[in-house]
């Protein structure tokens, strides 16, 4: 029975992986967009993390996670005799399937190794597989999703090295050194999860110093390779050994310095120290958070998650996705209720919670952004695109169209200023604009992409006269919710929810204006 349930949950995970929700711009701009610009001819946008004087993001972990699959896909594309570049949307879906696969294989495999009891293992695997976090965040291209897998496998390797039944732990120690450096260059928060589990290695290193030597050498070589790749990426000239010695680019160090300054974190939002504990963790775990408090199961997994939670709470910028590595660790460290009635109640609440959050985050959350970019890439007349009240769209999905199309992200712009921009950029209205599809033959076109719930636009959309701006709806995607437009203060709770949910969707309008003859 549990195997059929698990298989069903795996298929649900795949279904969510193939849904175009957009959880945060970082899932694109801190990974796929960077590497896509290196492998393909897609014009891309590098964010401040990669363009500042002291860059804080490493490309070292991006190459094995995203670069190798892209190179393989490119090789297969050329090998099949296809002309031109691979459509970016094909690369996008390939990466989603890849994230599903490594989550399904590596995350679940790690749980099998970390949990000795078959009964408890089945419960833990089913809890993790039925979590909306696994369905959504873990199937998206976040560095946090990669960190989840690296933390889990670091615990597996620590367990193997510390196992007294192992005749030799040289291989496990060597791999642990490589994985640990990979984890640090992926996210500097990674060591926080190994503070307590790492203590298990001290007696092992005392008894078997060879394992310490192997771990140190592997970590040192991997560090040199990582710094070399980053230095080659960020320095404009060809890298020499002199550059690596005298002006290396050490991104984890830059990242730590940046995040240690409160004035830097203030640009992204400051939170109280307890935000992770009372806000983000219950949001990720749902009703399982109560069981974690009432019936925890002490294990190395629990201590790893707790140490990560404590260290991350010391930083003032706290987002829920920063705690992704703790989710499988916490879910595998709880005991199910013994009372049958309580068990059934928990199961019902758990299923309802994950179905609700899974649908919200996995289907509707900014769900029209990716399809919207694909739509714009197919519009021959599009030269200006203004995105209002949405997340920043992935530029590389335009398939080279952005050589001619200027994308403007004006998410928080006031409505009056938006109209000013549209008035400046809108093309002149012609009879062709009023006939079906004739406008596509024009050389220039201005498009506004905004949520259907943006009621501020309503008075202007119905203009059919000769004066002012004209908005012609040319595309609509229904499965889109804009949670950043919840104005409870002005509209009240129920009116706001009715507007955002009732008028869900993302719309593209072609904007023109009356011009003097």
Curated annotation (Swiss-Prot):
EC number: 2.4.1.-
Pathway info: Glycolipid biosynthesis; glycosylphosphatidylinositol-anchor biosynthesis
UniProt record, GO biological process: GPI anchor biosynthetic process
Location of the protein in the cell: Endoplasmic reticulum membrane
Organism domain of life: Eukaryota
Signal peptide: none
Topology in membrane: Multi-pass membrane protein
Glycosylated residues (UniProt): 339, 444
Keywords, in A-Z order: Endoplasmic reticulum, Glycoprotein, Glycosyltransferase, GPI-anchor biosynthesis, Membrane, Transferase, Transmembrane, Transmembrane helix
GO MF term set: alpha-1,2-mannosyltransferase activity
Transmembrane regions listed in the UniProt entry: 59-79, 86-106, 175-195, 209-229, 274-294, 343-363
Gene Ontology CC: endoplasmic reticulum membrane
Described purpose of this protein according to its UniProt entry: Alpha-1,2-mannosyltransferase involved in glycosylphosphatidylinositol-anchor biosynthesis. Transfers a fourth mannose to trimannosyl-GPIs during GPI precursor assembly. The presence of a fourth mannose in GPI is essential in fungi.
Family affiliation: Belongs to the glycosyltransferase 22 family. PIGZ subfamily.
Protein name (database record): GPI mannosyltransferase 4
Organism listed in the record: Gibberella zeae (strain ATCC MYA-4620 / CBS 123657 / FGSC 9075 / NRRL 31084 / PH-1) (Wheat head blight fungus)
